[in-house]
A protein has these predicted regions:
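Canonical positions in the second alpha-helix
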Residues: 30, 63-64, 97-98
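Structural signature of tandem alpha-helical TPR/SEL1-like repeats
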Residues: 16-25, 50-63, 85-94
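Canonical tetratricopeptide repeat
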Residues: 43, 77, 111-115
Length: 128
């Protein structure tokens, strides 16, 4: 209905103005009315990424991917999070999935593969 999408629209406007606290409340309200609001979960993940809250970011990214396993932006963000956490196996699996489904974020494919390769070479050095 119109009411829920108003929460999402206003949340995006506030997010773009970097008013993360107020936009977070609106995205959460949108989810109350529309538990399948892929965009609200994605924006919440971006807010938690901005706040360095890896736990909440991962929960919201997983919600996006549960609703739409092809969401390349969520996959991209989750690969970066797993690289940050040095979770090699999970990052590799997600990276393979990202390469298969990337649409709007295909330009990020090379960048993310380089980060992944750097992580694996750094791990190899630290294990010697």
């Amino acid at each position: 209905t119109a009411k829920e999408s108003d929460y999402l629209k206003k949340g995006i406007e506030l997010f773009q103005k970097k008013d993360f606290e107020k936009s977070k409340i609106l995205f959460e309200r949108d989810i109350v009315f529309d538990p399948k609001s892929e965009k609200s979960y994605l924006y919440l993940a971006k807010i938690f990424n901005n706040n360095d809250n890896d736990f909440e970011q991962e929960i919201n990214l997983n919600n996006v991917l549960l609703l739409n396993p092809q969401n390349d932006e969520a996959l991209y963000m989750l690969v970066l999070l797993k690289i940050k956490q040095s979770d090699y196996n999970h990052a590799k699996k997600l990276l393979d999935q990202f390469v298969l489904v990337c649409k709007s974020f295909c330009s990020k494919k090379k960048e993310i593969q380089e980060k992944f390769e750097k992580m694996t070479s750094d791990d190899a050095k630290s294990n010697n």
